[in-house]
Amino acid sequence: MRKLAFSILALIIFINGQAQQDRHYSMFYAAPMTINPGATGFFPGDIQVFTGFKNQWKSISSNPYNTISASLDTKVMKNKSNNSFLGLGVNFYNDKSGDSQLTTNIANISINYAIEIADNHQLALGVQPSFFQRFASMESLTWDQQWTGSTFDTNLENGETLITDKSFQFDINSGLYYFGKLNNQNSINFGVSVAHLLTPQNTLLNGNENLYQKYTIHGGGEFSKNGSKLAFSPNLIYFKQGPNQSLSIGNDFIYSLKESSKYTGYYDKSTISLGSYLRIGDAFYTTLFLNFAEFSLGVSYDLNMSGLSVATDGRGGMEMLLRYRINLSKSAAASL
């Protein structure tokens, strides 16, 4: 019964062409470039590599929702006198969902330029040209015209015409990002972004339904007392895309295991953090983030609270993130 309920829900979403397949991560604050091109290059170090995996609805479907992503960003043309830089990044995503194996592939390039608007306060504007493709398989789906009165006969014509074109479509995202360092212990960030400025076609059936533009507001910070090993990091994100909207808010408690070097200037701080977040009306999730100098590993688990929780027993999905940061000045010093 649970699988039937889920299949009906997935089928309705599929037919209406409103399956907004924009990837989203619970630990959105760990990779801000993926939600806002304006945040490209805002990290300690010179090069940042990020990979992520998210699995949802495994408890009610043999074909759960899986998202895999990878990204790299860096900053060039750095001017230390005014703290300006040009940020460059690339992102790749693969998303598969449901019995139809609805697949979305995305590749985009992030470009931004950051300027200092006051001492230790920076503002950046970014754009993100994007290419994506979306396709699905009809073989595992059943339709109303295949219902015989007691069962579905997949040998019957389904009466639907699926668009099988796998060519890439072009789109553009944009965003504005602010980062402020209040002192050595405290910092804040805030951003707004608009995705799908070109509103490309979204439906896989005959029709002219386009993808809604997506508006996102996000912010956060990190705060601690001087000399304290404990910090807290509140974060929030809100987005609206057509009739869909979501608000996530929560906090990470960060414990410092090792401080940054005061002599090399390299960010080799090691921390462990535990967080709890609420996605209003949808899920509660917890996070664990381990940061050991250049390497970071994050894990989160969603507990479903929406109407679908009757079928899921509250089991939403797991997420894993891996991040690696490179400091070229440290590498050069080590080679001397």
Protein language model annotation of sequence segments:
Residues 20-336:
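Subset of outer-membrane beta-barrel
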Residues 4-13:
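Sec-dependent N-terminal signal peptides
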